[in-house]
Amino acid sequence: MHPVNPFGGQQPSAFAVSSSTTGTYQTKSPFRFGQPSLFGQNSTPSKSLAFSQVPSFATPSGGSHSSSLPAFGLTQTSSVGLFSSLESTPSFAATSSSSVPGNTAFSFKSTSSVGVFPSGATFGPETGEVAGSGFRKTEFKFKPLENAVFKPIPGPESEPEKTQSQISSGFFTFSHPVGSGSGGLTPFSFPQVTNSSVTSSSFIFSKPVTSNTPAFASPLSNQNVEEEKRVSTSAFGSSNSSFSTFPTASPGSLGEPFPANKPSLRQGCEEAISQVEPLPTLMKGLKRKEDQDRSPRRHCHEAAEDPDPLSRGDHPPDKRPVRLNRPRGGTLFGRTIQEVFKSNKEAGRLGSKESKESGFAEPGESDHAAVPGGSQSTMVPSRLPAVTKEEEESRDEKEDSLRGKSVRQSKRREEWIYSLGGVSSLELTAIQCKNIPDYLNDRAILEKHFSKIAKVQRVFTRRSKKLAVIHFFDHASAALARKKGKGLHKDVVIFWHKKKISPSKKLFPLKEKLGESEASQGIEDSPFQHSPLSKPIVRPAAGSLLSKSSPVKKPSLLKMHQFEADPFDSGSEGSEGLGSCVSSLSTLIGTVADTSEEKYRLLDQRDRIMRQARVKRTDLDKARAFVGTCPDMCPEKERYLRETRSQLSVFEVVPGTDQVDHAAAVKEYSRSSADQEEPLPHELRPSAVLSRTMDYLVTQIMDQKEGSLRDWYDFVWNRTRGIRKDITQQHLCDPLTVSLIEKCTRFHIHCAHFMCEEPMSSFDAKINNENMTKCLQSLKEMYQDLRNKGVFCASEAEFQGYNVLLNLNKGDILREVQQFHPDVRNSPEVNFAVQAFAALNSNNFVRFFKLVQSASYLNACLLHCYFNQIRKDALRALNVAYTVSTQRSTVFPLDGVVRMLLFRDSEEATNFLNYHGLTVADGCVELNRSAFLEPEGLCKARKSVFIGRKLTVSVGEVVNGGPLPPVPRHTPVCSFNSQNKYVGESLATELPISTQRAGGDPAGGGRGEDCEAEVDVPTLAVLPQPPPASSATPALHVQPLAPAAAPSLLQASTQPEVLLPKPAPVYSDSDLVQVVDELIQEALQVDCEEVSSAGAAYVAAALGVSNAAVEDLITAATTGILRHVAAEEVSMERQRLEEEKQRAEEERLKQERELMLTQLSEGLAAELTELTVTECVWETCSQELQSAVEIDQKVRVARCCEAVCAHLVDLFLAEEIFQTAKETLQELQCFCKYLQRWREAVAARKKFRRQMRAFPAAPCCVDVNDRLQALVPSAECPITEENLAKGLLDLGHAGKVGVSCTRLRRLRNKTAHQIKVQHFHQQLLRNAAWAPLDLPSIVSEHLPMKQKRRFWKLVLVLPDVEEQTPESPGRILENWLKVKFTGDDSMVGDIGDNAGDIQTLSVFNTLSSKGDQTVSVNVCIKVAHGTLSDSALDAVETQKDLLGTSGLMLLLPPKVKSEEVAEEELSWLSALLQLKQLLQAKPFQPALPLVVLVPSSRGDSAGRAVEDGLMLQDLVSAKLISDYIVVEIPDSVNDLQGTVKVSGAVQWLISRCPQALDLCCQTLVQYVEDGISREFSRRFFHDRRERRLASLPSQEPSTIIELFNSVLQFLASVVSSEQLCDISWPVMEFAEVGGSQLLPHLHWNSPEHLAWLKQAVLGFQLPQMDLPPPGAPWLPVCSMVIQYTSQIPSSSQTQPVLQSQVENLLCRTYQKWKNKSLSPGQELGPSVAEIPWDDIITLCINHKLRDWTPPRLPVTLEALSEDGQICVYFFKNLLRKYHVPLSWEQARMQTQRELQLSHGRSGMRSIHPPTSTFPTPLLHVHQKGKKKEESGREGSLSTEDLLRGASAEELLAQSLSSSLLEEKEENKRFEDQLQQWLSQDSQAFTESTRLPLYLPQTLVSFPDSIKTQTMVKTSTSPQNSGTGKQLRFSEASGSSLTEKLKLLERLIQSSRAEEAASELHLSALLEMVDM
């Protein structure tokens, strides 16, 4: 084994070679404890010495040629042993002896004070030997040390130097770890450089010097000396060489395993790029576009031709070239020289181009490019002009002085640069000012202030945060402003402001950011090691970029770091890649990573090495699926990255912190993208880990819903999505994987209902359904794949059912169900889904919600998605069903809606109804067709309590599909030990799976055994052995502690074929071993002796010192610990005593405080109570006083008002009384005055009259004696009876006057008589005016109908009675009009005056004679008062009061003279509203005539005014009324004028009564059978007859079935026509239950009844049947036919009848074929064309017609008549509109073509039908009353069918005889079969002709003619003999053709009657058997 590094604990010495002298061994003082060791650090005398021996050889360059002397040397590194306090390590240095400007080599220099050994073995070619233009063999010779040059080996990140004419050479590396440190590998390189004259080579053997922080330091330029004083590392080498610093075991350190397969040409190309590296940034994933071509040649050309090569700075390294694992000719050294020469040849060709690259520094510029601190480490080459030996010595002195700087300064600078987040100070051009007052935080003020200091570029202010950002044009200005800008305010604090660089953007070139003077800044230490195969990883500051990144959307882990996923290739490629991979990965072992970010960077570096070591496959034949090896729920690297990025969920952190809980972290989902790299095996989880992850989610996460549902759902969804992605990437398909996808599906199904009420930001139902669909699709494919393998999953039926439930709206989902496996298709889950599909698509919401209530929880969650859809459709159906028209509304109870549609409560139902436009009030919903809305989108779904109750177990058990599994216990894998050192467990577990190897090479194996003694066992015990057979890495390989484990560790999982290379020269292993042994022995012979002796002494001293130090440390530590423990105990005891005292004091104070508070509270309570009572009393008293004052004031005011009012009234009354008395007095005085005058005038007139009588005008003729007597009154008084009887009046002296009394009496009698006559005349007129009309006579006389029973219905529309008084003319007119339409013999209804209702006034049902016939007259009079209310309208529509109305009569109210215009318009509007209400409440068809009665004489313009006021023309145009007239009637009813006009109006209404509907009535069965007979039988039997006559095969069954189903569909459309819904028929008052031929029942045209009729008619349809292929075997065809016929019967009891008939038919067909066939085989049978398909369909149709049962009971019981029949009503003219389907027409055309072909072959020869027996045709049943006509018509049709094909008379007799023979054969066959059945049943039935006790209704309704034939005896011989006699009689008689046709018709009818009777009897027998 390799000895422990001898330089671990003592001061090393240094051996250095200068240009002129050799030094001596010199010892320095001991080093400082804790100081890291660095390569090339020149220690001061107080620090350390260097121990170095550099065997080297060199050839000085001569002339002006530029030569590079490759060195072949061995460098050994030392690692810190027990103590890590070494300040320095042995450094190896050599000076360059070349003075040529282009001769650049790496040299290790030391100060003059450092001594060196004089013994340095050098070997190499002689100086000055020149090879011509060719290549010659190199000679080896020892040269003095002053000519030796040490050429360090550059790594992929440390590019070699290159001068103007120099190209870096290629090299090989043989490496092995040395020491117990981090395990670096020793490079073994063969570099070579050629030029035009000299070819030289040298070898450098170097061992790795491992320590905690070994690094190369970059030299310092003269211009930046002050800046480089802060650099922590030391530089070594000449001015022409530059090394950048590296951390522990970094790729650039000695001991780095440099890849041998990286040619020098690529190094030359990368040199141009490495001069100016891009700024550090977060690493982006590699783009596939960038990975297309990675050849070194192409990359070099791109580097040379690209004008801006810095833009390619973020490209990953090129792919490693492919090397075949094959033996090569020549020796090892010869092959090496050849390859180096070839690479240098190509490099020389591109040298001129590379010299123009911008990456090289011009002469005079700085030595190296400045890379910001800590971001990356590279070896930066530079090109410097020629320097002399004096300049080199002066530079060495400066460097040595700088090497002694304190490490503390370097640490401070490193920390400062690290705090900037990996950003160079040169890029900091902005400052950030905080704590700025608001009045100063203004852009103008800040710009003005800082413009005085430097030139400001832009200013950003944020007053809310009291900060501002000021950008300057350069770093110097920003630094000056940061220094002097604090004068703005005393509280202002200024910091640097760093830009946040997006990881998706490329970085700008460094030279655009920096000036020439700034480009020479030194490279800082890199905090991480970097892979030699990839770009360095940038380490951004954890506290800067990460914490200040945008919180909106953080980049995902796998999105930022896209990985490739190709496994390591096999063969030589795999060997080469594995070798370099293991070599590179071994350098990572032991690296310390303290923080999570450092650990992530280290693991990411490991992944990049592994990813670049693999070879991508482009051959699909060799492609294979990934195999995951991740043992944890989340890969380790992702855990560290997400903790760094703060991308952890609340379920993945340690409670109370933001640190990741490694046991609870679950892999996050990463969306796939085009530029994403393929995953590595350890990034994918195998099936077992995925199952454990799912078990963890189910048991630990699913039921955690205490926090945010959004976080819970996002976490579970994301992690299950990641599980699905891992399954997809690994192409897993097994039952375990299926169970994982099933659990994901259950989770999404549960969330579909559970999360439906969450906002869109938390839960998106659409995305959830998409994921559910993807899961179900994956399951469907996996089920199919596993079924193909013979594996059946137990849950397949469950999830296929879920798939169907998810796609219920998909049209072809049933087709997919038919494709399921029979076990799955017939499972309860799939059957349930099919039932849900049927309920949803048929809008059967009752069935749907019943299924929801009976469903499982997950099924109910899926059905919940359709709740809004089914509810909307159900609401639409209810709205249409419960409303009559669009203008009417219907009230429906809200509780019914909640119950039927399964709402949670009334509130949810109300919201849903309001969303669809319906209003809810008082617990009822108002259904209205016009108000119903159908929004475009569905309303927001809500959770259902009914579904929630089904969740009886935890969510985890629901998702798991059963009881929860045990909680998974697993300890996550960690690649770091307790000291945070990388130990590489992941590497040990991944490489055996992902690495492929072709085979072992004996030589390589031997080489590994030879160097096994030098392997560091403790460090590399976990490393795998690299493949020793790789020709690309002929170096010393690493071998683990157990050699036996190496083969298994590197054994390939699969061994792909390797193409055999072309034959090449073969060299043996002995040659290789010999050459390598010689080289190693010669190079190490002297060096190993010195190193071993010094190492032994060092180890001895170190052991002694370490023992003493350990004892001292243990003693000191123990003493300190004991003292600390004792002090703590004492302090704790004192603290306890103090706490007890304090608690006692606090308790005492607390009690005192409580006592004081109690007393104080009591006092305050008493005071507050007293104060409160006082305030309340005062307030109460004030209120009472105020109230009393107000009351007193009101009383006084009232009293005063009363007194004033009384005084005023007294004054007013006194004045009024005075005026009244005055006026009365004046009137009385006037009266007295005139009365007195009148009295005086009367007295004067009397006096004058008396005087005139007493004193005549002339002297009296009597004497004087008689004069006095003459003046005395002499009239007779009293009058005597005698004079009175004589008619005389004695006037005395005046004489006697005769008076006639009889004339006066006669006049008196005449007057009295006239008065009586007039009185009775008026009374008769009044009686006549109030007498009812003789409506039956008027109707029978004027109704234009010819039916024997006539119906007429009139609706009187009267004004509102509430608006008129009982004695008003309008009220009298209404009563008069009611009386006119009330008959004496009528059934008078409830005649009331209630407005807003329609009442039956009278109903007439009498017989009336018209001419010589008597008709039944049925009249109904309805009356409506005023406008109807909504409830009255609903009652009218519900009770169908207006159904069958024949006319309307509207009475207008009388016009009042004082009526204003507004009131008149209002009366018109009221009448119009009343009229429109009635017109809209009745069915729309037919339109009715209208009579408008106008009271009083309104003048000539009354008709025009009525038309305009009622808008009668508009009503006519709208087809609401058919016609109208305006009739003026008197406003009084004293004469017959009104009666005459009303009678005329009634006659006009009757004459214009709507025409009678052409409705036909039949029972449902009769209607179907007549339709089938009319439209199907005639066509079908005619086609069958033609095809049989032509010996053609039967018609295809699908065509016959389609014709039959088409006829049924036509019949269903006729009987359920939409025209029937709007018909106003029958008259409701005369309708009967069950209906009749004249009057149907009330619900005959309701939509529900018509829909039931349509469904019932369609129930006769036959299922479709396709014709089997022509070559189908007989038995499968028979099975298909039997299976088809089993679908026809409606019950299992009638199925055997049809089955036996079909089997009998098939047996006869087979027997017929067997008789025709000569030698039939057992497996053969009749062909498909020979099967009588038409007869099979005929049997099915016959059975369907006999065995049909209605689908369910009718909607209304009124549809059933007394005998149980259902009558249907239809328009007869619609039956003529049937169109034959296209398939039947095509079949008929095909038949005609075949007939033509048949006739063409056989000429006019008639073809006799076959004599085989076939079933009878369809049973024809007809309507009662049309039996004879139908029978005769059918007979005539049959005759026409027989004669249709004959055109000549000579063919007539033959056609007739053929038909008779056919009928005869059919009769004979049937009678034989019947006799056979009767003989079998003779024991059970004594009389075979007796009918059974029960007969179907279809058979009972046979025509009478057929019933009479049923009594014919069933014996066959009498019938046959009678038929034969009739036939012979027809043949013998020489009667005419007409008589023959008649005889033929009679025979056919008789034959059919016999068949029907036999069929009837047979059916009866079969039904009795079934009973």
From Swiss-Prot:
PTM annotation: Phosphorylation at Ser-502 is induced in B-cells by CD40-stimulation, but not by bacterial lipopolysaccharide (LPS).
Basic and acidic residues bias locations: 288-321, 342-359
Bias type Low complexity, positions: 232-253
Residue positions where Phosphoserine is found in the record: S424, S502, S531, S550
Alphabetized UniProt keyword annotations: Acetylation, Acyltransferase, Chromosome, Coiled coil, Cytoplasm, Immunity, Methylation, mRNA transport, Nuclear pore complex, Nucleus, Phosphoprotein, Protein transport, Transferase, Translocation, Transport
Localization per record: Cytoplasm; Nucleus; Nucleus envelope; Nucleus, Nuclear pore complex
One of the Pfam families matching this protein, by short name: SAC3_GANP
Disulphide-bonded residues: none
Polar residues bias spans: 8-29, 38-50, 214-224
Any one cellular-component term (Gene Ontology): cytoplasm
Residue list for modification N6-acetyllysine: K483, K484
Domain of life: Eukaryota
Transmembrane as UniProt keyword: no
One GO MF term: histone H3 acetyltransferase activity
PCI domain mapped to chain residues: 768-951
Modification type Asymmetric dimethylarginine: residues: R32
Region of interest called DNA primase, as start-end residue ranges on this chain: 414-550
Reactions catalysed according to its record: L-lysyl-[histone] + acetyl-CoA = N(6)-acetyl-L-lysyl-[histone] + CoA + H(+)
Role this protein plays: As a component of the TREX-2 complex, involved in the export of mRNAs to the cytoplasm through the nuclear pores. Through the acetylation of histones, affects the assembly of nucleosomes at immunoglobulin variable region genes and promotes the recruitment and positioning of transcription complex to favor DNA cytosine deaminase AICDA/AID targeting, hence promoting somatic hypermutations.
Family: Belongs to the SAC3 family.
Subunit relationships: Component of the nuclear pore complex (NPC)-associated TREX-2 complex (transcription and export complex 2), composed of at least GANP, 2 copies of ENY2, PCID2, SEM1/DSS1, and either centrin CETN2 or centrin CETN3. The TREX-2 complex also associates with ALYREF/ALY. Interacts with RNA polymerase II subunit POLR2A and with the transcription elongation factor SUPT5H/SPT5. Interacts (via FG-repeats) with NXF1; this interaction is not mediated by RNA.
Stated name of the protein: Germinal-center associated nuclear protein
UniProt source species: Mus musculus (Mouse)
